[in-house]
């Protein structure tokens, strides 16, 4: 199921929109993935990480195929996000993040807005790690 959702899901959704973007000569594709798709994590999530990695690889290749059409394709690989679980769990998890807190939805939204803007027209094929410094590249 992880490959179906996290790889083929990205591919199918992107294919539904890409032709129109290429015909118009402008478009921004931004996918949300996970740091588990870029680095190994010893938490028993191998299949999940492989699925996320497949979606990331797809976006990198797609970016090269459509770059000359004015369409960009980038991925945001997020780290731990505060999903309002048990406060003691959240506090423990936050201690493992170098900036000292978990991500918030607005952290992701700000980067999506930038990547979808004309200011990001020269950025394509990138996987941006958004994780409070937990993984650096």
Model-based region annotation:
Residues 14, 51, 59:
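Active-site helix of classical SDR
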Residues 19, 64-65, 121:
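Alpha-helical segment proximal to the catalytic Tyr-Lys
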Residues 1-4, 92:
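Active-site Tyr-X3-Lys motif and surrounding loop/helix of classical short-chain dehydrogenase/reductase
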Residues 67, 72, 123-125:
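Short, small/polar-rich loop/turn modules that mediate ligand/substrate recognition or access, typified
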Residues 39, 113, 124-137:
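Short C-terminal tail/terminal secondary-structure segment
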Residues 40-49, 61:
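Active-site loop-to-helix junction immediately N-terminal to the catalytic Tyr of the SDR YXXXK motif
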Residues 34:
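Residue(s) in the substrate-gating loop at a strand-loop-helix junction
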């Amino acid at each position: 199921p992880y490959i179906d959702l996290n790889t083929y899901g990205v591919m199918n959704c992107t294919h539904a929109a890409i032709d129109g973007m290429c015909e118009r000569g402008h478009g921004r594709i931004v996918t949300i993935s996970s740091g588990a798709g870029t680095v190994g994590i010893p938490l028993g999530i191998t299949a999940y990480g492989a699925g996320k990695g497949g979606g990331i690889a797809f976006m990198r290749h797609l970016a090269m195929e459509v770059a000359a059409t004015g369409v960009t394709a980038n991925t945001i690989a997020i780290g731990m996000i505060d999903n309002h679980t048990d406060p003691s769990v959240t506090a423990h998890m936050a201690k493992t993040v170098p900036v000292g807190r978990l991500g918030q939805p607005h952290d992701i939204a700000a980067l999506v807005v930038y990547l979808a803007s004309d200011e990001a027209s020269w950025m394509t094929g990138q996987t941006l790690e958004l994780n409070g410094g937990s993984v650096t590249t």
